[in-house]
Amino acid sequence: MPRKGHVTKRDVLADPVYNSKLVTKLINHLMIDGKRAKASSILYDAFNIVQDKTGKEPLDVFEEAMNNVMPVLEVRARRIGGSNYQIPVEVRPERRTTLGLRWLVSYARLRNEHTMDERLANEIIDASNNTGSAVKKREDVHRMAEANRAFAHYRF
């Protein structure tokens, strides 16, 4: 943590093709070893597959998928009186998008299709239909928060 003041968040530039900051953030999550061109080509190919399979605008399908993946509640561990409690807290908007993108990419990587663009496209389509592993992860997180609702009064 810095000793001198607060570190400001740097804003990402909007994507040149879809003019969306969310798409740029997805490219950044896809990127491995700084290979941005490779990550963006994977994403654009995935969006083409999404358009072919659904017949809808890929950005709309992606935003729908993100709305279905982003968590509203999560649990955070807090030590009270010698024991750890899982306390449900609301997720801040910035963290919601970060978690949604992280889960979407990580569960796309775990899929069994041949290429990464196919995996990502199918995960986006599944998430927009409220199915798929990323949506299941969100449901698990919400279920944990619901199960620990008794500790909500501790607050973080």
Swiss-Prot record:
<dbReference type="InterPro" id="IPR020606">
    <property type="entry name" value="Ribosomal_uS7_CS"/>
</dbReference>
<keyword id="KW-0694">RNA-binding</keyword>
<dbReference type="Pfam" id="PF00177">
    <property type="entry name" value="Ribosomal_S7"/>
</dbReference>
<keyword id="KW-0687">Ribonucleoprotein</keyword>
<dbReference type="InterPro" id="IPR036823">
    <property type="entry name" value="Ribosomal_uS7_dom_sf"/>
</dbReference>
<comment type="function">
    <text>One of the primary rRNA binding proteins, it binds directly to 16S rRNA where it nucleates assembly of the head domain of the 30S subunit. Is located at the subunit interface close to the decoding center, probably blocks exit of the E-site tRNA.</text>
</comment>
<comment type="similarity">
    <text>Belongs to the universal ribosomal protein uS7 family.</text>
</comment>
<dbReference type="GO" id="GO:0019843">
    <property type="term" value="F:rRNA binding"/>
</dbReference>
<keyword id="KW-0699">rRNA-binding</keyword>
<keyword id="KW-0820">tRNA-binding</keyword>
<dbReference type="GO" id="GO:0006412">
    <property type="term" value="P:translation"/>
</dbReference>
<dbReference type="InterPro" id="IPR000235">
    <property type="entry name" value="Ribosomal_uS7"/>
</dbReference>
<keyword id="KW-0689">Ribosomal protein</keyword>
<dbReference type="GO" id="GO:0000049">
    <property type="term" value="F:tRNA binding"/>
</dbReference>
<dbReference type="GO" id="GO:0003735">
    <property type="term" value="F:structural constituent of ribosome"/>
</dbReference>
<comment type="subunit">
    <text>Part of the 30S ribosomal subunit. Contacts proteins S9 and S11.</text>
</comment>
<protein>
    <recommendedName>
        <fullName>Small ribosomal subunit protein uS7</fullName>
    </recommendedName>
</protein>
<dbReference type="InterPro" id="IPR005717">
    <property type="entry name" value="Ribosomal_uS7_bac/org-type"/>
</dbReference>
<dbReference type="InterPro" id="IPR023798">
    <property type="entry name" value="Ribosomal_uS7_dom"/>
</dbReference>
<dbReference type="GO" id="GO:0015935">
    <property type="term" value="C:small ribosomal subunit"/>
</dbReference>
